[in-house]
Structure formats: structure tokens, C-alpha cells
Regions:
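Hydrophobic residues within beta-strands of alpha/beta enzymes
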Residues: 32, 80, 110-112
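Flexible, glycine-rich active-site loops centered on histidine and acidic residues
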Residues: 2-15, 45, 86-153
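N-terminal beta1-alpha1-beta2 module of alpha/beta enzyme domains
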Residues: 1-74
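Glycine-rich, flexible loop/turn motifs
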Residues: 44, 55-61, 74, 80, ...
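Acidic (Asp/Glu)-rich catalytic clusters
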Residues: 25-26, 68-77, 99, 103-110
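Structural motif corresponding to the early beta-alpha repeats
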Residues: 65-73, 79-88
Length: 153
């Protein structure tokens, strides 16, 4: 059976995620995903893949894990997920703990979508060279897998 989900930028002016999640669950949606951008650099040369001007939502994006915790607290069965989390911009030890915690408090409903990102300047502000993003992505996924599956990682 086909399942339907929603995706939305969680911002300070969007529908609050607890209200959106509760409504989505009542209407029969399977999932709710939110994207991630830590910030948009004031001086950005990277073109937005969408073509035109970068939508203002990018400048106002809330933290996905805190936002999804709010969504999980307002629902019982709605799957919650990142679409996507920029793990090239995150510490893998801290992220592994945040992801495991959110999955636990949501009752196993978290879907973790990950990616490397497109915004070169944003990435470089986190100390990651754009040319190494795929290597860093792989390393951090493997590190998190070790943390989640080994007694000592």
C-alpha cells in the first residue's frame, strides 16, 4: 500500500510542528520530514540547486532534531525524519547520541535521512572542504554505525 508523508521547513513562522504532526497523523499521513541548514552564510557564492533565489525558509530553519522531538511528543504513530540531515556539518559522536535519543523517545519512529549538502560556504564554516564532503559523509556514517552497534567504539 502506498504511504504518504509530508516535508516542511520548520521555521519560526511556519505551522508549529506539534500542530502539523498531530493533524497529519489524524489525516492518515505516514510520516513528516524536516530539512536541515545550520545557517546560510552572509557571503554565499554557491548557487541554490532550485535555480532562482534561495527561499527565505533557508535562513530561518529550526534545528531538525529538536523540532522532530516536538512532533513526536504530539503523535503516537507518525514516523518522523530528517530530509536530510547534513552530517558533514555535525560532530558524529554527538549526532549519534542525538539520533539514538530521538529514536528512543519517539518509540522507534525516526527515519534518518542524511546527505552532504550543496552549500560550499556553509560547509566550510564547519571546517569541511567541499571537495571532501563525500569522504567525510562516509566516515561519519561509519563512525555512527560503530557507536550504535559496538559496546566500545
Amino acid at each position: 500500500m502506498v504511504q504518504f508523508g509530508l516535508t516542511m521547513f520548520a521555521t519560526d513562522y511556519s505551522v508549529p510542528l506539534d500542530i502539523l504532526a498531530g493533524t497529519a497523523e489524524k489525516l492518515g499521513f505516514e510520516s513528516l520530514f524536516v530539512p536541515e541548514h545550520t545557517h546560510i552564510p552572509a557571503s554565499r557564492l554557491s548557487p541554490w540547486p532550485g535555480g532562482a533565489d534561495l527561499p527565505r525558509d533557508y535562513w530561518h530553519t529550526l534545528d531538525p532534531f529538536v523540532s522532530l522531538a516536538l512532533a513526536a511528543s504530539a503523535t503516537k504513530s507518525l514516523k518522523i525524519g530528517t530530509g536530510i540531515s547534513l552530517i558533514t556539518e555535525r560532530d558524529p559522536i554527538l549526532m549519534a547520541k542525538q539520533v539514538a535519543t530521538l529514536d528512543f523517545v519517539s518509540g522507534g519512529r525516526l527515519i534518518l535521512g542524511v546527505g552532504a549538502g550543496w552549500n560550499q560556504e556553509e560547509m566550510e564554516n564547519h571546517g569541511v572542504a567541499f571537495s571532501t564532503r563525500w569522504k567525510i559523509l562516509r566516515e561519519r556514517i561509519l563512525a555512527m554505525r560503530e557507536i550504535w552497534t559496538q559496546d566500545e567504539a
